[in-house]
């Protein structure tokens, strides 16, 4: 049996399958389809023709627009029908034609999307991705499987992110870019192949980061990518000098972390 709150408003032409949970204040428009294992938390809104399926939880206040398909099976040849999940956080906006897939059993079975994110038309979140908070994915952005997008990242229209790649906090990826390697926090990447073109100074300024701090991050960036040793060695060499600067420490920790991908750099040669 479905659990449907009294204050939920469900259009008579919508389909809510037995077993679904529909919270207080939820609005479900005409021709929507809600699967039997779906949980719609308070004040979720599904506009006409939206589909939420699979073992999917949609957080409070999230809006899903027409023709979006949220919670579909992972697009993986290894998926054999296992019960995997998708979790979408609160106050997200999921625009027309967006697709989000559940995880795969071999990698924990979870795709996780955070709060206050904006997914523009026809963008795609593949299986096992981790998307943070306050992320903007512009039209036609594609995340392959196992991608990690940290908080406050902006991905320009038509950009594509290779599987297992990480994009660090508050990085900016330009439109139509191919992201094949990890992008450091606060980095700005453009092109195909994607290369670092400096720091996301505009984003840092908008976030209220002090100009003196931005200057220090720029100095650290130059030391990391223009030094004579490898990127990782250069980063390790400046750690003590910048221990009092959280923004630089984030970059250094990101570089030092284990990853399946190399690091994006300002040149075609990867020194990571």
Curated annotation (Swiss-Prot):
InterPro entries: Acetyltransf_C, Acetyltransf_C_sf, Hexapep, Lipid_A_LpxA, Trimer_LpxA-like_sf. Pathway: Glycolipid biosynthesis; lipid IV(A) biosynthesis; lipid IV(A) from (3R)-3-hydroxytetradecanoyl-[acyl-carrier-protein] and UDP-N-acetyl-alpha-D-glucosamine: step 1/6. Gene3D superfamilies: Hexapeptide repeat proteins, Udp N-acetylglucosamine O-acyltransferase, C-terminal domain. It is found in: Cytoplasm. GO terms for cellular component: cytoplasm; membrane. Coiled coil: none annotated. Its EC number is 2.3.1.129. Keywords: Acyltransferase, Cytoplasm, Lipid A biosynthesis, Lipid biosynthesis, Lipid metabolism, Repeat, Transferase. GO terms for molecular function: acyl-[acyl-carrier-protein]-UDP-N-acetylglucosamine O-acyltransferase activity. It catalyses: a (3R)-hydroxyacyl-[ACP] + UDP-N-acetyl-alpha-D-glucosamine = a UDP-3-O-[(3R)-3-hydroxyacyl]-N-acetyl-alpha-D-glucosamine + holo-[ACP]. The keyword Transport does not apply. CDD domains: LbH_UDP-GlcNAc_AT. Pfam families: Acetyltransf_11 (PF13720), Hexapep (PF00132). Belongs to the transferase hexapeptide repeat family. LpxA subfamily. Homotrimer. Involved in the biosynthesis of lipid A, a phosphorylated glycolipid that anchors the lipopolysaccharide to the outer membrane of the cell. This is Acyl-[acyl-carrier-protein]--UDP-N-acetylglucosamine O-acyltransferase. It comes from Rhizobium etli (strain CIAT 652).
């Amino acid at each position: 049996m479905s659990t449907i709150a009294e204050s939920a408003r469900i259009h008579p032409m919508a389909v809510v399958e037995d077993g679904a949970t529909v919270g207080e204040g939820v609005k479900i428009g005409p021709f929507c389809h809600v699967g039997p294992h779906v949980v719609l938390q308070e004040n979720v809104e599904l506009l006409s023709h939206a589909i939420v399926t699979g073992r999917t939880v949609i957080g409070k206040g999230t809006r899903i627009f027409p023709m979006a398909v949220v919670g579909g099976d992972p697009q993986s040849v290894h998926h054999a029908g296992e019960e995997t999940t998708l979790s979408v956080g609160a106050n997200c906006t999921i625009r027309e034609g967006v697709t989000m897939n559940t995880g795969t059993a071999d990698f924990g079975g979870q795709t996780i999307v955070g709060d206050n994110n904006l997914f523009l038309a026809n963008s795609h979140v593949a299986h096992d991705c981790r998307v943070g908070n306050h992320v903007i994915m512009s039209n036609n952005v594609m995340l392959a499987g196992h991608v990690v997008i940290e908080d406050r990242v902006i991905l320009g229209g038509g950009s594509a992110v290779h599987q297992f790649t990480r994009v660090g906090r508050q990085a900016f990826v330009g439109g139509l870019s191919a992201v094949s390697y990890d992008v450091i926090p606060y980095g700005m990447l453009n092109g195909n192949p994607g290369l670092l073109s400096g720091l996301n100074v505009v984003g840092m300024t908008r976030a209220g980061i002090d100009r003196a701090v931005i200057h220090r991050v720029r100095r650290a960036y130059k030391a990391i990518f223009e030094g004579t040793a490898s990127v990782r060695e250069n980063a390790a060499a400046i750690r003590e000098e910048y221990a009092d600067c959280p923004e630089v420490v984030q970059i250094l920790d990101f570089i030092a972390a284990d990853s399946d991908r190399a690091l994006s750099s300002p040149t075609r040669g990867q020194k990571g």
